[in-house]
A protein has these predicted regions:
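Active-site neighborhoods of metal-dependent hydrolases
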Residues: 25, 32, 38-48, 55-63, ...
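Core domains of carbohydrate- and sulfate-ester-processing enzymes
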Residues: 12-21
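A gly/proline- and charged-residue-enriched helix-loop-helix capping module
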Residues: 5-13
């Protein structure tokens, strides 16, 4: 979920420090629905370790113990579990990985031991599931040692090195040896909205896009309609900044087989025939020409 930082600074009174105090603050807020909470790894790590935690440095044994105590306290106060992020898609406003992204199994299992002391809780993780990280090995070890259920975000994604079938096979293998790992799926496919007035579109990485990116809507559309500018823009090759998110930029600029027109019916299950790539082929055009 993405939101402006001003929504937090203007919409919340920061009148707590501990997790139990946070729950008390939530209790005082008017709301239309019930809410459940998880103790967040990033906040706990930064609180215990300061800049070392925010910078994803390795913790000491005492750091891990302190984090485990805070998480245990949070669960005893009413949290349903603990959550951690291990994906390069989750970054701070400065572009840095959120605290805990690269935490090693010793830290994660140490925190889970604190959860076990509380007597309940679900350990939740969102990960890129890079094969070399051996995520399912430590998830299995954690669950078997602590008895906790461990859940991960199971997605079929063009940017994940491990497909969904492999994810589920590894989960079942660990569970056959006594672990309790569960896969969580999205209620619908997730994606990005691309357009002239959004943060990105298929032409954002072409050099000439800089000429129109900051224009107001009327001037931008007029420039894009200019045949000479359109020809120049289409002739250029996208230039991607060096980043661990480069693959995402390439998908936005070149992944027309996975891009669809957003129509008034908001169809979240379009067919392959409705993709920009297929419509372009039918029209005898390239993907970027059609877009």
């Amino acid at each position: 979920m993405l939101f402006r930082s001003s929504a937090l600074s203007e919409g919340m009174s920061w009148n707590w420090e501990s997790f139990p105090e946070y729950l008390d603050a939530l209790e005082e807020l008017p709301r239309a629905i019930d809410v459940a909470t998880q103790v967040p790894h990033g906040a706990v790590r930064a609180y215990v370790m300061g800049d070392r935690g925010a910078g994803n440095e390795a913790p000491t044994g005492s750091d891990i113990d302190a984090m485990a105590c805070i998480v245990e306290e949070g669960l005893r106060a009413g949290a349903l579990g603990f959550s951690t992020s291990r994906t390069v898609l989750h970054k701070s406003i400065e572009g840095e990985l959120v605290p805990g992204t690269t935490a090693d199994p010793e830290e994660l299992i140490g925190i889970a031991r604190g959860m076990a002391k509380a007597g309940h809780g679900v350990f939740e993780m969102s990960s890129d599931l890079v094969p070399e990280w051996n995520e399912f090995d430590w998830m299995g070890d954690m669950s078997r040692e602590t008895g906790l259920p461990v859940t991960f975000t199971a997605l079929q994604s063009p940017v994940k090195a491990m497909n969904l079938d492999d994810q589920l096979a590894k989960m079942r293998s660990q569970n056959a040896r006594g672990a309790n790992i569960l896969a969580q799926i999205a209620m619908r496919g997730t994606g990005l909205i691309l357009g002239w007035r959004t943060s990105f579109n298929p032409f954002s990485f072409k050099p000439s896009w800089a000429e129109v990116a900051a224009l107001n809507e009327a001037d931008q559309l007029a420039k894009l309609a200019d045949p000479a500018f359109k020809k120049k823009l289409l002739s250029e090759t996208s230039v991607y900044p060096e980043s661990d998110l480069q693959f995402l930029g390439q998908l936005m600029a070149e992944g027309f087989e996975m891009q669809y027109a957003l129509t008034d019916d908001f169809n979240y299950e379009p067919t392959k025939e409705q993709s920009i790539a297929n419509l372009a082929a039918v029209d005898g055009a390239s993907g970027d020409e059609y877009a």
